[in-house]
A protein has these predicted regions:
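Active-site neighborhood of divalent metal-dependent phosphoester bond hydrolases
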Residues: 45-48, 53-123, 130-131, 138-154, ...
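Residue-level marker for buried hydrophobic side chains located in beta-strands
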Residues: 5, 31-33, 60-61, 123, ...
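Divalent metal-coordination and catalytic microenvironments
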Residues: 8, 36, 51, 63-64, ...
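Active-site-proximal beta-strand elements of phosphoester/diester hydrolases
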Residues: 2-10, 122-128, 219-221
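N-terminal active-site segment of His-dependent metallophosphoesterases
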Residues: 1-50
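Conserved beta-sheet core of the metallophosphoesterase superfamily
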Residues: 184-250
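Active-site environment of divalent metal-dependent phosphoester hydrolases
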Residues: 10-14, 39-42, 66-70, 131-132, ...
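Catalytic phosphate/metal-binding cores of nucleic-acid and nucleotide-processing enzymes, i.e., regions
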Residues: 6, 77-79, 99-103, 131-140, ...
Length: 264
């Protein structure tokens, strides 16, 4: 029984299945996800159907694209949120969800996604968020789900896009992005999720491969699974991390270990 974490999927079914085959994902294993199941990629419905079929063996945190999908399914989406979603690649998911037969079941599934997953040896969250924002929560972070996140007060713009909650600035303090002036200590001061427990995130697609900053103790495994060379001048990959061994493999066949790719 192994535990795997997959980066943002974004409707990239074929690459997802390739990566899972390469890591030898089996019927006894559990698959975690950094969020963002749909949008941008070509096979949103296939991804939803497959992941739902895993039942309790699949666990995903809330990504910003999942928020839009849930709003649409629960008929709470505003015009501004809908426009923002469409601008960010949501049209393919809209068409899937508009015609979906099991809308109630899919809505319940999305609604169950938590903001954060805390395990004994790692935590999973879509991206890093400032401590001052998370400390406002009226609900313990571990109890926030898609259904109650609007009541938690950690999301300022439920009907649009909250760039404070879905933040990239803290991650950009890593030497991966800022070789001359890295600020891992400042990042830890800004986000209390950076501590002795490994934090695994997605949200920020990486064209240079998996990020593992040992000093910040954060790992980003979003390697742009939806990207195509024709559109983005980069052939995206879905990366799957074995959290027990720290080995990972991507859909191109590249494999390594976090210790081998750590930012020094």
């Amino acid at each position: 029984m192994s535990r795997f974490i997959v980066g943002d999927i974004h409707g990239s079914y074929d690459r997802l299945m390739t990566a899972l085959d390469l890591c030898k994902f089996s019927d006894s294993d559990t698959l975690y996800c950094t969020g963002d199941i749909g949008d941008r990629g070509p096979d949103v419905k296939k991804c939803i159907d497959f992941l739902m079929s895993l039942k309790d063996r699949f666990k995903s945190v809330i990504g910003n694209h999942d928020v839009w999908a849930y709003q649409y399914l629960s008929d709470t989406i505003s015009r501004i949120s809908s426009d923002t979603w469409e601008y960010n690649g949501g049209r393919c998911t809209m068409s899937v969800l508009y015609n979906i037969d099991n809308k109630e079941e899919v809505t319940e599934w999305y609604g169950s996604f938590p903001y954060i997953i805390e395990e004994d040896d790692f935590r999973l969250v879509h991206t890093l968020t400032y401590t001052k924002k998370l400390e406002r929560s009226k609900i313990p972070l571990s109890e926030i789900t898609m259904r109650n996140i609007d009541d938690s007060d950690i999301i300022d713009n439920f009907f649009g896009y909250d760039s404070g909650l879905f933040n990239r600035h803290i991650l950009y303090r890593s030497k991966y992005f800022n070789e001359k002036f890295p600020s891992p200590q400042l990042a830890k001061e800004e986000c209390f999720l950076l501590d002795d427990k490994l934090t695994v995130i997605g949200h920020t697609p990486l064209t240079g491969g998996v990020l593992y900053d040992k000093e910040m103790n954060v790992c980003d495994i979003d390697t742009g699974g939806f990207c195509t060379y024709k559109q983005h001048k980069y052939e995206g990959k879905i990366t799957v991390l074995n959290i027990d061994t720290k080995d990972f493999v991507d859909s191109s066949g590249f494999s390594s270990n976090l210790d081998a790719v750590q930012v020094l």
